[in-house]
Amino acid sequence: IRRQRQMCIRDRLSGRKISLKQRSTMQEATAAPQMGGIVRLTGFILRITALFELAGAALLLPTFCADYGLRGIWYALFHSISAFCNAGFDLLGTEGAKFVSLTRYAGDPLLTTVIAALIVFGGLGFLTWEDICTYRLDLHRYRMQSKVILSATALLIALPAVLFFLTDFADLPIGERILASLFQSVTPRTAGYNTVDLTEMTDASQAVTILLMLTGGAP
């Protein structure tokens, strides 16, 4: 199946005709509701993925290059892709203590905002993004799935963030406290990054974090 998906992508990029079997594989890989329009949807997925990941890397570049020199280019690209794909992998544990994740950048508004945004954008799913790009603010034309995903995402970010702000991170300056609260409400569902020591969070916040992990992201 993996080889078939790679062949589909190769043929799509090269402009070759996509067979019925390949279209079926593409439908399965993208969780599309029907086979019709699957080639166009796959092209859209490739374009929007490249757009977000390259834009994210460009925004992360100043921070990582300032800390790691030319290696920062690779770090920016890697973490942008990892965040958008909701993978949660990082390269920062090789620079000191293990399992540090993004704690070094807890007070960096640019990096934490970009990473959090990439996680959210990647977690919405491509069918939701197709609705957003096609219908813009005409929300009543969105698929029901997209409406549910957007509403649930907003609630699952806002409510835990308020809880975390009220119960945790009291020792941080107000700006960092807001950043940490928002970041920790975004990342548990799909990515797994952290900018604070999770063991120091209250029991209630840890329980909410576990529930967010169980919830996950959109198809």
Regions picked out by a protein language model, each given a short descriptive name:
Residues 1-219:
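Membrane-proximal intracellular helices of multi-pass ion channels
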